[in-house]
């Protein structure tokens, strides 16, 4: 039984499609938006319309921005010799928040996942290989998740880049800052031991 009109139910259904929002959270979010109509709903609707009209995918790296090439690709302070490969834009944003890289990026659009039907043709791997052959590029950093699909993708890309004149590196895996050994899984501890560095 519907407790609100079809327009409100539609809003709730659309909000429930967002990651992390189930039906109950979507209902609470809809009520909050309706209560804060002028302070929140109207500016949100305006921001969404701007996103629809102006946001696009960068033709160079796959980032999303209001211009293509994006602000990262056109930033002259970035090191053009380094390309950091990430699975998706959220990973790029995480590295940027951490100020972890001064290089340029390449967004694959996911990782290889045979079980989910995601193959090389579904990702931007060919474009990465082309970029890796550019004379100014000297290092490709594989910043992919330490999952089976991430590892598979990293190995596949490494094999493809054998003929490119670039150094291929990957992020270290191991003990997180502030992490306690007792709480880490065996795979993480093993990786940390194998990739240990001088102190």
UniProtKB/Swiss-Prot annotation:
Signal peptide: none annotated. One of its GO terms (biological process) is DNA recombination. Pfam families: RecR_C, RecR_HhH, RecR_ZnF, Toprim_4. A zinc finger (C4-type) spans 58-73. InterPro entries: DNA_Rcmb_RecR, Rcmb_RecR, Rcmb_RecR_Znf, TOPRIM_dom, TOPRIM_RecR. SMART domains: TOPRIM (SM00493). Keywords: DNA damage, DNA recombination, DNA repair, Metal-binding, Zinc, Zinc-finger. The keyword Lyase does not apply. Residues 81-176 form the Toprim domain. GO terms for molecular function: DNA binding; zinc ion binding. PANTHER family: RECOMBINATION PROTEIN RECR. NCBIfam families: recR (TIGR00615). May play a role in DNA repair. It seems to be involved in an RecBC-independent recombinational process of DNA repair. It may act with RecF and RecO. Belongs to the RecR family. This is Recombination protein RecR. It comes from Bradyrhizobium sp. (strain ORS 278).
